[in-house]
Every structure is written in C-alpha cells, then in structure tokens.
Amino acid sequence: MHKLVLIRHGESTWNLENRFTGWTDVDLTPTGIEQAKNAGRLLKAEGYEFDLAYTSVLKRATRTLWHCLDEMDRTWLPVEHSWRLNERHYGALQGLNKADMAKQYGDAQVLVWRRSYDTPPPALETTDPRSERGDLRYAGLQAGEVPLTECLKDTVARVLPYWNESIAPAIRSGKRVLIAAHGNSIRALVKYLDNISDQDIVGLNIPNGIPLVYELDADLKPLRHYYLGDAEAAAKAAAAVASQGKA
C-alpha cells in the first residue's frame, strides 16, 4: 500500500480578503503560516516521513510546504516545483472580491465560475497587467500554455500529465510523496483519483492547511482517504470555503 499526502496552502492574503486569486502570486497571512506549521506538527506527531515533495511555482504553496517541512525537520527533502500544480486561473475575476461579484451577478453565477467543471470565467485580455504572460517563471512555456482563464476541466488537463509522468511513477517506485498545492489543482487530482463525476465535483471543497491522506493500492487506486486531525474541524473549514462566493 502507498500513502499520498495532499495539502492545500494555508490562508493567503487574498483568501482573507475573499478575492479570486488564481495565478496571482500572493503570500500567506500569519494564520496561513500557522496552518502550515500545524500541518507539519500533525504529520510529525503521526509519524509520517517523506522522500519527495511537489509544489507549484506560487509562493503561498511553496511557503506552506517549507513551513510544514520545517516543523518536521525535513527542509532538506528534494522538492520539485511545477506550474502544472498552480491554482486554476480565474481570468478577469482575479483580484475581484467574491461576495461583490455575487451581489453583481448572483450567487448561482459565481458558483458556476468557482466550482463548475467546464465553464471558465471571462478571460483576461492579453494586454491586461494582471496577465502572467511575460512572467519570468513561465519563460520556458509556449504563450498558449500560460492561460488567460481556466475552468476545472482545463486544470485537470494540465495536472494529469504531470501526475502520470512524474508523481505517479515516483509513488510506484516506493517514494513517499507530499504535495502542497492549491484548492483547484488538488480538486483536479481528487476528481481523478476518486473518479468523481463532472456534476458531483461542484460540491467538493478543500480546506486550507489540513493534510489529506490517500491510501492507494499497487495500481494507485484509492483504498480510502481522510483528513488528519479533527474531522469535524476539517468539515467546518471546507464548508467555510464553500460559502466564500455568496453575497
């Protein structure tokens, strides 16, 4: 049996301000830092060890991973960064307040933008200063690979090749893997692992900073999954994420 641990980054400054974040590179709040440290303490207390970690190229995830590993005294672990683990791109919504958008467009429309599988938000213009095209961290990508908006289906399409080509082979070889990523890149992985339908994925919310453990068989099919720590607290945190897009 293999174990895989997924952690959504701790609370970010734009989580606190209830803004759509996407690929915008915002930092952790003090609460987010403490969430990341607590995840590390929890993993250490439960006896978890890792051989390899993966994260995105956005600082809220990379710093979550660092704080987590620091608490475990494992900052020396090899870490692989990939843009494919970035948060879903929220297009022209990036930087805008979710509740304000719900007041303007209605809760139902914002829910579609936030949680539907195949409906992206309005795209950024290529000339919009919020666009990441031209950002040095994406210099090795083709222009079309740096999105102007994404739906979850698009996020799945970039996450799964990375899973199949890098992460899954590492797990099969016996590596104990930790992934620190984002709400929607984790939703993309969970959708794939648990074979969640396009309709049911709308109801899945990932809380900040709580380790999600998957026990996988030899074919990397899930045997079970669970959040470490207080299950009721994890459920409340997920419910709080769900309510962010309401007026």
UniProtKB/Swiss-Prot annotation:
The keyword Isomerase applies. It holds the Pfam family His_Phos_1. GO terms for molecular function: phosphoglycerate mutase activity. Signal peptide: none annotated. The active site is at H9, E87. InterPro entries: His_Pase_superF_clade-1, His_PPase_superfam, PG/BPGM_mutase_AS, Phosphogly_mut1. Substrate binds at residues 8-15, 21-22, 60, 87-90, 98, 114-115, 183-184. Pathway: Carbohydrate degradation; glycolysis; pyruvate from D-glyceraldehyde 3-phosphate: step 3/5. It is an enzyme of class 5 (isomerase). It comes from the Bacteria. Its EC number is 5.4.2.11. It catalyses: (2R)-2-phosphoglycerate = (2R)-3-phosphoglycerate. PROSITE patterns: PG_MUTASE. The record marks H182 as: Transition state stabilizer. Keywords: Gluconeogenesis, Glycolysis, Isomerase. SUPFAM superfamilies: Phosphoglycerate mutase-like. The keyword S-adenosyl-L-methionine does not apply. Catalyzes the interconversion of 2-phosphoglycerate and 3-phosphoglycerate. Belongs to the phosphoglycerate mutase family. BPG-dependent PGAM subfamily. Homodimer. This is 2,3-bisphosphoglycerate-dependent phosphoglycerate mutase. It comes from Acidovorax ebreus (strain TPSY).
